[in-house]
């Protein structure tokens, strides 16, 4: 609408035919506009006569009138932001293309204000708003740069716009402006770059535009907002394995910068620094680098804070770091065990509980010494106290941790005496396959070479069907893994040479029947790997029957 009028006005003005008419309409529009501005609180500038008066000034060839129009748009959008239509946006977009700095500055401010509204964000891009905004980002005027970047930052918060912005050529100028000496421009540019990091494709475009070194360099900015935007953007970029490889090759100072930011005075920066390190620590190299950069002490401080997001980001990070076997002892020596155990009971936040118990399991994974230290820190007592009442995801992690600790021959008696069977047996009834399997695996580990089997005798039928009920259900489940766990556990119980326990098994006709059924199973040669697994279960079942026969014969002879 507006551009067409402008062309017509420009064309007729040369021969003077309509010049007085245009001048009159402009004078009339100025007078009307002044009257509307007198009553601005009651005037809707986005429709009807007020918008027509503004549009007349916009499409005038008089630069002063264009300046007045752009300043009016900037002023009214400062206090009245709402959804508008193309009749409002097109005049502002026309003003963006003016060569005049004042017009550009005010028009981009107005557009940035309107770009706060969700519907306007989409329409501005649909009407071609990105091209003039990109041009303004390259303006030598800092105010124009600042407003244009601020507008793109707002536009980039809408999912529908992000890919369009990434493909528009805006990322190069945004990356350059992130290094601006003007803090407002820098802040807006890094905010826009952050908004572009929420999808794989856009992150890739950002990396290709050379944003990574700029974001890393700006981690040392004195401005907290810039630190936050850059840390969060790098955290999102580090989600992708290919980007982590690029970061590892080109940014040797990244880990140390993020470790330093965990000591920031701003909790939101601390939080994002820990989350960025957590994403980096998906890779082995970074798991080691964070420990070498003295990242454990600041993580421990965050883990012990009273602010939930800080605790969550720190415990998520330490979980990933603890995956590397070489980090187990350094983490334990930094005194993480007790705080991690305390986290299990001090919050009902499921994520925090999962990360905490998973970290404890990782720390116990590769040495009996570390398993003993985890046990001494009270991890098992805390799990026993909580496990029947926590969400299934936490139950799964807790039972997996107990199963790992139960691998240590030195700790089995201690674990049994703590009463873990009293919670593991009921959890074999869980609706979760994982919880069932972990609980049964823990019972199986505890049944091997334990010395004193009296607790298995005590728990033969209780609680909830006891060891007897659990073995029966797993043997008849039809699940190869469950059957394997149950048959292997039975074999350990037979090998215990505990007469009372073996006598109880011998009298359990249902168990013996299931064992015979498995022992007599014919293996179909369909799948080589399945055959091996099934063959092992059959062999274990046959060995159980053999030991049962020997013990029964021995009992007859002794009798």
UniProtKB/Swiss-Prot annotation:
Membrane-crossing segments per the record: none
SUPFAM superfamilies named in the record: ARM repeat
Disulfide-bond pairs as recorded: none
Pfam families tied to this protein: Arm (PF00514)
InterPro entries: ARM-like, ARM-type_fold, Armadillo, Vac8
Topological type in the membrane: Lipid-anchor
Keywords (A to Z) from UniProt: Lipoprotein, Membrane, Myristate, Palmitate, Repeat, Vacuole
Residues with lipid group (N-myristoyl glycine): 2
Keyword Repeat: yes
ARM repeats: 77-116, 118-157, 159-198, 200-239, 243-282, 284-323, 325-365, 409-448
Residues with lipid group (S-palmitoyl cysteine): 4
Compartment(s): Vacuole membrane
The keyword Repeat appears for this protein: yes
UniProt xrefs under SMART domains: ARM
Protein family: Belongs to the beta-catenin family.
Summary of the function given for this chain in its UniProt record: Functions in both vacuole inheritance and protein targeting from the cytoplasm to vacuole.
Name of this chain's protein: Vacuolar protein 8
Name of the coding gene: VAC8
């Amino acid at each position: 609408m507006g551009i067409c009028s402008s062309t017509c006005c420009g064309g007729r003005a040369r021969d003077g035919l309509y010049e007085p008419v245009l001048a009159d309409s402009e004078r009339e529009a100025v007078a009307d506009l002044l009257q509307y501005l007198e009553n601005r609180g009651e005037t809707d500038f986005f429709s009807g006569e007020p918008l027509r008066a503004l549009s007349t000034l916009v499409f005038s060839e008089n630069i002063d009138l264009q300046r007045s129009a752009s300043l009016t748009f900037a002023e009214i959008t400062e206090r009245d932001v709402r959804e508008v239509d193309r009749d409002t946006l097109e005049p502002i977009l026309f003003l963006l293309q003016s060569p005049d700095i004042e017009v550009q500055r005010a028009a981009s401010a107005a557009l940035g204000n309107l770009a706060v509204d969700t519907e306007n964000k989409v329409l501005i891009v649909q009407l071609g708003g990105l091209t003039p905004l990109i041009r303004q980002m390259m303006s030598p005027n800092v105010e124009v740069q600042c407003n244009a970047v601020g507008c793109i930052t707002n536009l980039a918060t809408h999912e529908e716009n992000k890919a369009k912005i990434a493909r528009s050529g805006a990322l190069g100028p945004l990356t350059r402006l992130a290094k601006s000496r003007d803090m407002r421009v820098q802040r807006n540019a890094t905010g826009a770059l952050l908004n572009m990091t929420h999808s794989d494709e856009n992150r890739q475009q950002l990396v290709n535009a050379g944003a990574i070194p700029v974001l890393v360099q700006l981690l040392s900015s004195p401005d907290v907002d810039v630190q936050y935007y850059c840390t969060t953007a790098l955290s999102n970029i580090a989600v992708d394995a290919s980007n982590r490889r690029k970061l590892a090759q080109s940014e040797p100072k990244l880990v140390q910068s993020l470790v330093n930011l965990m000591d920031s005075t701003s909790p939101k920066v601390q939080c994002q620094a820990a989350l960025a390190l957590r994403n980096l620590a998906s890779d082995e190299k970074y798991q080691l680098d964070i420990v070498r950069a003295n990242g454990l002490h600041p993580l421990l401080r965050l883990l012990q804070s009273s602010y939930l997001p800080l605790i969550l980001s720190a415990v998520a990070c330490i979980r990933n770091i603890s995956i590397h076997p070489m980090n187990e002892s350094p983490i334990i020596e930094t005194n993480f065990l007790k705080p991690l155990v305390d986290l299990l009971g001090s919050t009902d936040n499921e994520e925090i509980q999962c990360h905490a118990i998973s970290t404890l399991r990782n720390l116990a994974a590769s040495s009996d010494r570390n398993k003993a230290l985890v046990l001494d820190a009270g991890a098992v007592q805390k799990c026993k106290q909580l496990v029947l009442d926590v969400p299934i995801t936490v139950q799964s992690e807790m039972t997996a941790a107990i199963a790992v600790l139960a691998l240590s021959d030195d700790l089995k008696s201690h674990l049994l005496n703590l009463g873990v069977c009293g919670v593991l047996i009921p959890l074999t009834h869980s609706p979760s396959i994982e919880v069932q399997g972990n609980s049964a695996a823990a019972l199986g580990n505890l049944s091997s070479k334990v010395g004193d089997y009296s607790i298995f005798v005590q728990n033969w039928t209780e609680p909830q069907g006891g060891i007897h009920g659990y073995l029966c259900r797993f043997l008849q489940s039809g699940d190869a893994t469950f059957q394997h766990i149950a048959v292997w556990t039975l074999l350990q119980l037979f090998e215990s040479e505990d007469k009372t326990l073996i006598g109880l098994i011998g009298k359990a006709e249902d168990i013996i029947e299931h064992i015979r059924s498995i022992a007599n199973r014919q293996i179909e040669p369909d799948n080589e790997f399945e055959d091996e697994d099934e063959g092992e279960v059959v062999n274990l079942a046959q060995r159980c029957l053999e030991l049962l026969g020997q013990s029964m014969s021995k009992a007859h002879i002794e009798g």
